[in-house]
């Protein structure tokens, strides 16, 4: 989770509103131990939708529909090659994660 401190501040603020004490260390440890939210865009449908949006295969990250030069992808039994574009693979698998900058990182 990239915005651990931002989520920890939100949890600490909610704890302060309900109990009256602001304990950031507890909120930070709660945030670290929680994983990615349930779902979170990691379904097969979401992967295929993101791959179609950038005209790539959701399995091997090659161009889809294939051109004359791309013959190894049939979109059913293909696998990633030895050197594939890691940024494209990360976008298809996880979605947009680094586009929105954190407000906390700007102040530091």
Swiss-Prot record:
A zinc finger (C4-type) spans 57-78. Belongs to the carlaviruses nucleic acid-binding protein family. One of its GO terms (molecular function) is DNA binding. Suppressor of viral-induced RNA silencing. Increases the accumulation of viral RNA and enhances viral cell-to-cell movement by inhibiting RNA silencing. The keyword Zinc applies. The lineage of its organism: Viruses, Riboviria, Orthornavirae, Kitrinoviricota, Alsuviricetes. This is RNA silencing suppressor. InterPro entries: Carla-bd (IPR002568). Keywords: DNA-binding, Host-virus interaction, Inhibition of host innate immune response by virus, Metal-binding, Suppressor of RNA silencing, Viral immunoevasion, Zinc, Zinc-finger. Residues 47-50 are annotated as: Basic. It holds the Pfam family Carla_C4.
């Amino acid at each position: 989770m990239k915005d651990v401190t931002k989520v920890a501040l939100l949890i600490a603020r909610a704890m302060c509103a309900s109990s009256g004490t602001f304990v950031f260390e507890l909120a930070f440890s709660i945030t670290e131990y929680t994983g990615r939210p349930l779902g979170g865009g990691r379904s097969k449908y979401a992967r295929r939708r993101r791959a179609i949006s950038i005209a790539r295969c959701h399995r091997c990250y090659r161009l889809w529909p294939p051109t004359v030069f791309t013959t190894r992808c049939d979109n059913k039994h293909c696998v990633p090659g030895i050197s594939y574009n890691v940024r494209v693979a990360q976008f298809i698998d996880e979605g947009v994660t680094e586009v929105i900058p954190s407000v906390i990182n700007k102040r530091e």
